[in-house]
């Protein structure tokens, strides 16, 4: 446990940021999973789910939670599976 006041604050803010980052990554993964399931089932709303998933992937990459190449790979897989 840190003794310096600013270090104590950093621990607190890091915990908050970590929780936010984990939540955002989980939301992205869920959106991708729902989109892939909709594509597999050929659901009526698959275009909408793919659009939402791509948006969440872009937001996650923009926040540097995943690498840009990984984001591009996920989006490419969604688009090619949707055809």
Curated annotation (Swiss-Prot):
Any one biological process term the GO annotation gives: translation
UniProt cross-references to InterPro entries, sorted A to Z: Ribosomal_bS20, Ribosomal_bS20_sf
Entry's Gene Ontology cellular component terms: cytosol; small ribosomal subunit
Family: Belongs to the bacterial ribosomal protein bS20 family.
Stored PANTHER family: 30S RIBOSOMAL PROTEIN S20 (PTHR33398), SMALL RIBOSOMAL SUBUNIT PROTEIN BS20C (PTHR33398:SF1)
Pfam families per UniProt: Ribosomal_S20p
Record's function text: Binds directly to 16S ribosomal RNA.
Record's protein name: Small ribosomal subunit protein bS20
Record gene name: rpsT
């Amino acid at each position: 446990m840190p003794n310096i006041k600013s270090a104590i604050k950093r621990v607190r803010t890091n915990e908050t940021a970590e929780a936010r980052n984990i939540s955002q990554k989980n939301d992205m993964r869920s959106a991708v999973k729902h989109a892939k399931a909709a594509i597999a089932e050929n659901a009526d709303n698959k275009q909408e789910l793919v659009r939402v998933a791509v948006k969440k992937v872009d937001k996650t990459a923009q926040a540097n939670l995943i690498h840009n190449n990984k984001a591009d790979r996920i989006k490419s897989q969604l688009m090619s599976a949707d055809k």
